[in-house]
Amino acid sequence: MLKIKNKKLQGFLLVLLGICIAIFAQVKLLESRHGDLTTYYEIRRWVQNTWDNTSPIPGVSLYIVAGIFFLLGLRSFVDTLPTLRIDNSYHPQTAQKFGFWATSLGISIIIALYANQAKGDDRDGYLFTIAWAVSIILLIASVCMMTNWRLPSRSTIFSWIKIHRAELFVLAAILVVAFIIRFLDIELHPYSFINDEGQMGSGGACIVQGKCLNFFSLGWADQPRLAFFPYAISIALFGRTALSVRLISVITGTLSVFAVYLFAREVFNKKIAWLSAFILSILPVHIHFSRTGVDNIIDSLTAPLILWLIFRGMKRNSTLCFAFAGIVTGLCIYTYPGSLLAAIFGVATLGYVALRTPGFLRAHARNILVFILAISVVVIPLLGYYSSDNEYFLGRWKRETILQNNGVPAQSRATGLSPSEILTVQFAKSSLVFISSDAPGNFFNSPNPYLPPVEAIIFMLGMIYVLWRIKDMRYTVVFVWFWAVVILGSTLTGGAPTSQRMLMSTPALSIIVALAMTGILDVFKQFHQPIARFSPIILLGLMLYFGYANISYYFYDYRIGHYYEDPTNELTYETRTYIAPLHSKGRMYLVGNPDEPYLTFESFNYFSPDVEKLTFNTVTKEAITRLPKDKDILFIALPDYKSNLELISQWVPGGEWNAFPRRYQPDDMLFYSYKLTKEQLAAFTH
């Protein structure tokens, strides 16, 4: 007994020492990142700059030391989480009932033949889309028939709700908070509405107008038309507004919080599930992209959803779960191109579990076949399109990765760094952004890392905790999940750290932080049992602190710092209130720098599609005389061209003059406007 106590005391002290060194490491990392990031990431000066702490080496080295002590301490304790049990029992096949397997697959192949020839505005597009949906429904029906699945009775449902009412209440509270955080003041934060959001909105509007009928073709940025369908529904309900576009991300981001809860609940326990969901709900980078009307946020939903369905299917030997996992995996090809990584990772996870688990293939052969069939039924139609335009398949990856298009050699020539040095810097930027480095540009442009200091320390300790349990398949999956995204989504692409491409890592990050919080408290409880009574208070305190730190940063510091603001995007957004009322009865003329293609920004067309928009760069009386006089005219002038607009107002007086300063930086003007009726314009004579 004394030996056991001494072992636990030694382990506890090592864990405490690891935590203390980790705190010191985080302080060192934060102190080292002052000044220009370009200088900070000059890899050949890292060793030289170690002594004055202007490189990441001191902080990272201390974290390694902290990890060693923390890991040595953990070895004196046991992991109290229940083991993951996979249903590996073999169920002999019963006589097969008639299903629609061949029908479902046949419909999918027919649609692929159509997609191979059809154009984006093909009038039969909706018909084939409905047929595709029918093929998926037939597949699900076949699985239900094969497994004799039935809906649970009403009494069973109510009984289940009664048993789990406390858990459901906490989950509902987290989801409500997540939605409110993402929906509050959605049209003005982040400010402003950017061009890519306008592109997504116009893609949805094209569907609403009946111009983009073929969902098995590509739209803007080589994204399948189906990716724009949710925006079409929102625009049909709420019109051409910023709300319509951003609401899709709000819903997707909230659902991703639910999905990470489901996955963590399935493979760990409800406490870790609650914590994971809450941590993801308040993570600034996740909040930001859940409020921005681009579809990058979908990655944080598809990844945990696929993994939840796969693990649920493996634990329960549920063919229906495997079918839905295959459907969601297949749908990834129809969304943001980065979601393909979620699909690949889901398939890889299934393969990994099969290799690690004796008898798995025999027990789950039918489930795996259904999984593959479900993927095939969903993806074959779009593959039909790619077969005729194969240069678009993985086109975004080919353009963005530094491994193609002479990316690494070009950087090597420009910087004088070797390929290994370039990749090291890319990896450092992509990983340190989570705990200590800025997140410049890439649709976020935050001066702070993704995690506040205390949460960053717990995350790093969580990474060590996961390594301690790496032989457990659950921990391996979470560990690889996080780092696969960091490497493939940012390290190997241009402009690291690419915040918009690392969103799939955020659910894994939240799980790692949750594992660290519960794991450290469990170590304390094993060392001194009375601590157990304080653990709920400690967890609640940490959650409240994280919530305050993250939410106050994103909704106050980040907002008043104007880090996301851009005059060009502000121009296209704020002028909508002047341009849109013209409808088809007016024209807009932009007076500005002729070298800047402002009117190519899709936001102009999204908010006011029926208004003719032109440039007016030669401001003379003769030019005004030549203007068509059949419509009202709105002149929009950039601040540097105010004098040109004043000339117009002098030559053609009586119009409506407006000055619009930047919304959150009112000392700077954004634009001036001058509106003339067609009668006023017709009365003008040179």
Predicted regions and their residues:
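Signature aromatic-anchored transmembrane alpha helix within multi-pass, membrane-resident enzymes
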Residues: 172, 372-376, 517-553
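Transmembrane-lumen/periplasm boundary regions of multi-pass, lipid-linked membrane glycan transferases
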Residues: 189, 193, 199-215, 237, ...
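Membrane-interface transmembrane helices that cradle and orient dolichyl/undecaprenyl
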Residues: 144-148, 306-323, 332
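Transmembrane-helix motifs of polytopic, lipid-linked glycan transferases
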Residues: 247-268, 305, 458-465, 515
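Aromatic/acidic, Gly/Pro-rich catalytic loop(s) in extracytoplasmic/lumenal soluble domains
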Residues: 620-686
